[in-house]
Amino acid sequence: MLQKTKGIVLSYIRYRETSIIVKIYTEVLGLQSYIVNGVRSSGNAKSGGGRMGLYQPLTLLELVVYHQERANLHRIREIKCPEPFVYLPMDFQKTGIVLFLTELLSKSLKSEEPNPVLYQFLHHSIHVLDGQQEGVQNFHLQFLLKLSRYLGFATPTADDFLEEVSPYISADAIDREAVERLLLEPYGAPIPLNGERRRHVLQMILQFYRLHVADFGDLKSLPVLQEMQG
């Protein structure tokens, strides 16, 4: 049946010579995969669903899709991007954050059950990242801590968080002050963290996710993010 929904692109893989399979987290249908035929052919580069730019990580979409219960792959009838990014594609640092976040979201979002509250959080956060001018280097840290609330495993305080991760983290990497401020402050708040403290906090947060997300493992994009942030 036809279903209208908003969606956030997580990733895609090439399929055959000219097609892709794209993974999209939707507002109405949860996590879904769609096959898009001919999108990589030169003759279809600017027509309808054939624009590869629509399938870049974290792109915000409006979709009309053919959805069949119990099917693993679905098809897109109509697609548009009513909220194109303004700054994100041209910002080197933000691009690194996007690659990191999409890999993490692909590991963390596994349910086909819709979660409109989670979707709205993701939608809002992506808008913030696009427009944010100050404190961008801390965005991914705040995002991951906030996301854990919507995934159902957030801790109420920094002390509770540290109690969970401290057995797995070296003592010199524990930074209670940073975690507390990142938990409490809104996006963009001036939280002075140097590169070393930022890496330590991220190490703690990723360990926290490993404790709660099955098969979380390591993130291939992490070295790229750390190199970009210095």
What are these regions (language model features)?
Residues 1-18, 25-230:
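Non-catalytic alpha-helical scaffolds and adjoining flexible linkers that form interface surfaces
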